[in-house]
Amino acid sequence: MRNILKEDEYKELVSAAEGQTLDAVLCYSVPNARPSDFSFSDRREIFLWVLERLLNEGKIKLAKNGKFLDGTIDEQFECFKSVFPKTEEEINDGIWFFDELCPGGAVWVLDDGSLVWS
């Protein structure tokens, strides 16, 4: 799956997910025209693409236990990507995002600069 999301789909996803946990971002990581063979692997790829874009655009920061993660955006993203589950079973109905194995959660940066810790 190379053509991840159209720009309007990305904006719709961000609008729907803003202020919510990364589990919500994963739930919304589906194209409007979902192929019949759409798999968790496809959803995972979209989620990671969206996460990286949100980080690079400054729309979210990653934090754990009330503290922002150390390192560059690239380092944080690579850390997250390296441990992100490869199967739906490993996500465990979204519980993985709240487990110690998850490197961090989303802190949304709103247009006015205020932060929403999710």
Report residues per predicted region.
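A short, conserved structural fragment
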Residues: 56-66
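Short, amphipathic alpha-helical interaction segments positioned at domain boundaries
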Residues: 70-118
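Short amphipathic alpha-helical interface segments
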Residues: 1-42, 53, 64
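Short amphipathic alpha-helical segments that mediate assembly, nucleic-acid/protein binding
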Residues: 6-10, 47, 73-77
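Short secondary-structure boundary micro-motifs
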Residues: 36-37, 43-44, 80, 91-92
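Short, hydrophobic-biased segments on the C-terminal half of alpha helices
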Residues: 48-52
